[in-house]
Amino acid sequence: MGKVIGIDLGTTNSCVAVMEGGEAVVITNAEGNRTTPSVVGFSKTGERLAGQVAKRQAVSNPDKTVISIKRHMGTDYKVKIDDKSYSPQEISAMILQKLKADAEAYLGQTVTEAVITVPAYFTDAQRQATKDAGTIAGLDVKRIINEPTAAALAYGLDKQEDQTVLVFDLGGGTFDVSLLELSQGMVEVKATSGNNKLGGDDFDQRLIDYMVAEFKKDQGVDLAKDRVALQRLKEAAEKAKVELSGVSTTNVNLPFITMTGEGPAHLDMNITRAKFEELTADLVEATLGPTRQALADAKLSWNEVNQVILVGGSTRIPAVQEAIKKLSGKEPHKGVNPDEVVALGAAIQGGVLAGEVKDIILVDVTPLSLGIETLGGVFTRIIDRNTTVPTTKSQVFSTAADSQTSVDIHVLQGEREMAAYNKTLGRFQLSGIPPAPRGIPQIEVKFDIDANGIVHVSAKDMATGNEQKVTITASTGLSQEEIEKMKKDAEAHADEDKKRKELIDAKNQADSMVYQTEKTLKDFEGKIPDNEAEPIKKALEELKTAAAGENIELIKEKTEGVTKVLYPIIEKMYQQTGGAAPGPDMGADPGAGGAQGDDNVVDAEYTEVDKDQK
């Protein structure tokens, strides 16, 4: 195996590093810089530009310049340049090709293998898209690792003492926070949280919106409608943000920003740090929720956290540093370069894979729960969030209708009890199931998450061995609203979800009891005296009426009522015929049963596929 480079593919800037002489070093690019702008441009002659050269021509060529493409990874977003459309993977690949070329020039050899980092809160689709971008760029992506984990790896490489660290990673477009334990070469992630739609770009946008509003107030011209002016404002906002980390006031001076009826207009504005903090206060506050969540998930207190490590250029913002300091009660660690530490960690992981680095074990986790939709629209978890990866877990389900020959598997990711509120990762179908009464076929659904955090799902008919496998490739990513729904709504609506799930479980149990009772009455038709059959039929009708309503306690009561009159009769019938009475689990709650483990069978919401429509 040759050199395995480590790449931090960022929203605003990217960085590449490699192991040399047992140490991770950042590779300087062709322009002499240690980081490369994540910008792609297309010149008027059709030439593709990436990095600093693309950023330089952005003002004069805004329509053919692409920035912050990372925010669209894993979605069906397209970039239209002239008469061609580009996917986020293709644009990202152009940035990766630039980094690859810089690494090859530095090393003096061809580079074909890489470790690429992604935000810890990236979904399966976003991780797969990142891996695909690497492939397009001509790289064999040996591993996708989480950015906070990579940062901790770089921080902890030379640390001898055991410690617990919190990595607070606020980059250009994403935010992650992870709790990790470092112990003699072991880097173990305990919990992770974040927001895929929060980063430095959002801070820039607040400044842009403010300058546009102030200019419109003064000059009566809306700069938001001018692409060239907006690009200049974008660069000015980014520069002002950086300057306000070191000074209390900065001046934004953009001559000839636009033309008015009276001639050229100029933008000249002073912005104070206090104004900037006022404009972005809610963005800073938005980082604290996931931080508290990660701490709670790891079951740790701030007293048990030894270090708070700041990663990502946006953590240089004083208000961000002050917020995390106030929350944690600790002075953030300043011993790492927030722009480079992630790439250095990726290079170390590359060294581990290449055999250059010994005695380091990396243990990461999956950020969100994974499961499938089952009867009644319930989200049945198969892998819980913050489970160590790689991992494989399975659960056995059954059919929901008699003679059902195929099942649809609806794969989801999220934290809500109801499937409709979680994120669909994909769907696939298992067909060829031999016709049988419902509840008889046993279908094993297996989830496998590899070391890259990419999900593979299979469904297998235990009787025939017929199996269908799929690597989940969803076409949509998680927006900020969806992320908030998955985490915050899970708590805000916990009671509502719990009651709704309890109602569905009660209805499922009642439905199962109705089905079993009617089947029993049919099987013993003519053998049960009318005076004994009547109470069963009466209780059955009462149960059907209750099950049509929303009263959970009444449904449970009527289900129990059928059990009380039915079981003695069945036992008597079996004694008369010399058979054994059925087990006590007849009509058991299918929803609750499925949560017991791999040996249980639950009714899953599957749809029978008409043969003519296949």
Swiss-Prot record:
Low complexity: compositionally biased ranges: 578-589
Induction entry: By stress conditions e.g. heat shock.
Tagged with keyword RNA-binding: no
Annotated positions of the Phosphothreonine modification: T174
Molecular-function annotations in GO: ATP binding; ATP-dependent protein folding chaperone; unfolded protein binding
Residues passing through the membrane, by range: none
Record's keyword terms, sorted: ATP-binding, Chaperone, Nucleotide-binding, Phosphoprotein, Stress response
UniProt entry tagged with the keyword Zinc-finger: no
Region (Disordered) residue spans: 576-614
UniProt-listed InterPro entries: ATPase_NBD, Chaperone_DnaK, Heat_shock_70_CS, HSP70_C_sf, HSP70_peptide-bd_sf, Hsp_70_fam
Pfam family, one: HSP70
Family that this chain belongs to: Belongs to the heat shock protein 70 family.
HAMAP family in the cross-refs: DnaK (MF_00332)
Main function: Acts as a chaperone.
Name of protein: Chaperone protein DnaK
Native species: Desulfitobacterium hafniense (strain DSM 10664 / DCB-2)
